[in-house]
Amino acid sequence: MKRLLCLLLLTTLTGCGSFLIQNPNLQENEVTSATTNVDAVEGDKEEDTGIIDTLRGRSEPISGDPAWAPIHPKEKPEHYAAATGSLFNVDHAQDMYDDTKPRGLGDIVTVMLAENTKAAKSADAELSKKNDSSMDPLQVGGQELQVGGQYNFSYELSNDNKFTGNTSANQSNSLSGSITVEVIEVLSNGNLLIRGEKWLTLNTGDEYIRLSGTIRPDDIAFDNTIASTRISNARIQYSGTGDQQDMQEPGFLARFFNVAL
């Protein structure tokens, strides 16, 4: 029996030791975990660690976030030509029938925000159930059958259940304004991925607008604007930071008890 226990203990220690020893053949890129992608609006989307992140609250965005840095397209090599003395420059020439709509990486376009959504929902429920049951006293030979001279064989039951419930929800959102964004990618079908942000510094904090999505060049108007309703997979965020925003969020204890419930 002792030999068996010693053998099991030795096997366990050997397995733990082999688990702690890293394989020298592993490459560094195989050991390092992949970085998380950056969301188009919210910023870093790391996995939550549980109640700690819930109590900590939502992380505030910052101005100058690298995920929202402007795109700088690569410079095109200059075309060196012999000086002819003419004021005409081929590099800066534009076709008479060509438009100036954004079509390339780094081009800018103004988005006209015109969001207006309304939602209403109501539901009513009513349930009722009623049961009645009775039996007359039993008679034998014309006489009422009794037990002990006091109780007869009769009963009467009645049951009435009712349930009534109703609920209603109303929500409306409206957002108007404008924000200028830039093209960060040109898809193979010609559609453009856009992204941009605008920060406004106020007395007690900052307000910001962030927008991202996919647009068609054909939907861009002649004045280089496009309606927000023409954006596919639109992500629009309008919020703020600072004291005014902090006062609108529940405190530490309120978040704690909400999690507990």
Curated annotation (Swiss-Prot):
Where does the record place the S-diacylglycerol cysteine lipid attachment? Answer: C16
Look up the domain of life of the source.
Bacteria
Is Metal-binding among this UniProt entry's keywords?
Answer: no
> What function is annotated for this protein?
Assembles around the rod to form the L-ring and probably protects the motor/basal body from shearing forces during rotation.
**One GO biological process from the UniProt record?**
bacterial-type flagellum-dependent cell motility
Lipid-modified sites (N-palmitoyl cysteine): C16
- Main location as per UniProt: membrane
Kindly provide the name given to this protein in its UniProt entry: Flagellar L-ring protein
Basic and acidic residues composition-biased segments? 121-133
InterPro entries documented for this protein: Flag_Lring (IPR000527)
Q: Which organism is it from?
A: Aliivibrio salmonicida (strain LFI1238) (Vibrio salmonicida (strain LFI1238))
List the Pfam families hit by this protein, alphabetically. FlgH (PF02107)
